[in-house]
Amino acid sequence: MWNCKDKRCVLLPEKMGHVRCARVADYAAALNRGNMYEVLDVNERNVKIRTEEGRVRWFPHTCFVPAGTPLWYLVDFRIGADVEAEPCVQTEVTVVLQQDESEPVHSETRWCYFVTPQYLRQRFEEQAASNEAILPVQLGLNGMVLPVLSHSSIAQALRYLEMQDQLYICTEPL
């Protein structure tokens, strides 16, 4: 059903069945992460399915994984700094992720960090003031920029990453 090479999976048209939504992309109103969908047709880039509302639509292959593929879900998170204090420009976040459809239940504690544009500006100003070479700030996969740090902005960012099937990739093991 799936032909996977070069870390890219393509659904083979001769073996249609079911796929699982792993990533809602820009289709949050039409797709539900974790749900199974019957494949009605495929082409090189898209999968045709029937949504829960009964509409038949094409969606990118990248939104789906083979049926039975476990997904990671956010169970809990803890913010390392008092982000409600003024001003908080950077903090680490510990997340607990759990993989569904796995027996026994598999969970991992991981971490990531968030900074604000103000934090980056301060770093560059410190470099400029020290007359040292201006070096890039490398955030890595587990570092992210938010306009402001608050409990709600961090929660929203984590949920967004989860819905895009990126939360596991954007965190590091503790």
Say what each PLM segment does.
Residues 68-166:
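Short helix/strand-capping turn motifs
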Residues 8-11, 35-42, 80-87:
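Short linear motifs in intrinsically disordered
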Residues 2-17:
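Mixed-charge, Lys/Arg-rich low-complexity intrinsically disordered regions
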Residues 60-69:
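Structured surface patches comprising rigid loops and adjacent beta-strands/short helices at the edges
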Residues 17, 33-36, 68-70, 81:
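Small, basic N-terminal interaction modules of short regulatory proteins
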